[in-house]
């Protein structure tokens, strides 16, 4: 009787980007942001995420996103071309809820201005958006001395993001 063994493969990738490529990519991203801001184009899903990564995490976040999506696309193509598909399977992609930027900014603004006594209900009613903001490092319930008594506060990164995006829309 044959035994079936499953292997899960994971690996790290180090991507190096020359300053010339970085300058070109940064110029292209600024051009894309201006076009989207002026309404000249409506970005597709990939372009939207590139803009978010660029504005939130800078070139490092953008490069991480580009490398990750490139590898995912290459692996999907490899899977389609692979002859023995029964022995090569992919797990489903992690799907996260998509939020409107205005809703996201409202949550950041509310956490920034909401009295600590009202935060519990607000956080409970907007749990998915609060979780998204926390995962991006824009809010935190931790301080340097430990837990903040269960109260959420906007981080310096969250404040910069709010200012960059023009506050609550």
UniProtKB/Swiss-Prot annotation:
Biological-process GO terms, alphabetical: viral translational frameshifting
Pfam families noted in UniProt: Phage_T7_55 (PF11247)
Database matches in InterPro entries: Phage_T7_5.5
Lineage: superkingdom: Viruses
Note: It is believed that a second protein is produced by a -1 frameshift during the translation of gene 5.5. This frameshift may occur anywhere within the region corresponding to residues 85-99 of the sequence shown. Thus a portion of these residues may be replaced by a portion of the segment GLFQTISCNSTGGVL in the actual gene 5.5-5.7 protein.
Name listed for the protein in its UniProt record: Fusion protein 5.5/5.7
Species: Escherichia phage T7
